[in-house]
Amino acid sequence: MLCDSNGIPLCFNLSGGQASDIAHAQPLLDQVQIPSSQRGRPRKRCRWLLADKGYDAEHLRRYCDRYRMQPVIPLRTMKRKPKPGLPRLFDRPKYRQRNIIERMFGWLKENRRIGTRYDKLAKSFGAMVSLACTMRCLRHYFSYTA
């Protein structure tokens, strides 16, 4: 699941529970369209990619470098040989904004049907996630409290 800085879901992919998240990161980043605040077509790439330690892979960092995205991913705490050159910088204040996606997942799981996974088929579960994300977008853009 990918969301913007306001917690609005942009796109998602369904995968098996045993599948690693890093395998689905690049296809998810390729299909995203970020709506722009002005007129014109939506952007295809984000400025920052905030992710947890599970996404710490060299091929994802190279992908971010190729498309001029700044990865804000903490390094895994495993024994690793230091690479030559400058070490990658880690922006801790920016990384604290990652709680936005965690709050969005918490909000999504408040929907009982999604949290308990009542649906047997992936197609019907994906439809319920799409419906919940649509409701989230509509509440954000058309709230009565504004």
Regions found by a protein language model. Give the residues of each.
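Helix-centered, glycine/charged polyanion-binding patches within enzymatic domains
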Residues: S36-L121
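Residue-level signal for inorganic ion chemistry
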Residues: A25, D52, L131
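Charged phosphate-binding loop/patch that engages nucleotide di/tri-phosphates or the phosphate backbone
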Residues: M128-A146
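Active-site beta-loop-alpha junctions of metal-dependent nucleic acid enzymes
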Residues: N13-Q38
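Membrane-interface transmembrane-helix boundary segments in multi-pass integral membrane proteins
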Residues: L121-F125, V129
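Short, acidic, Ser/Thr-enriched surface-loop or helix-capping motifs
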Residues: D4
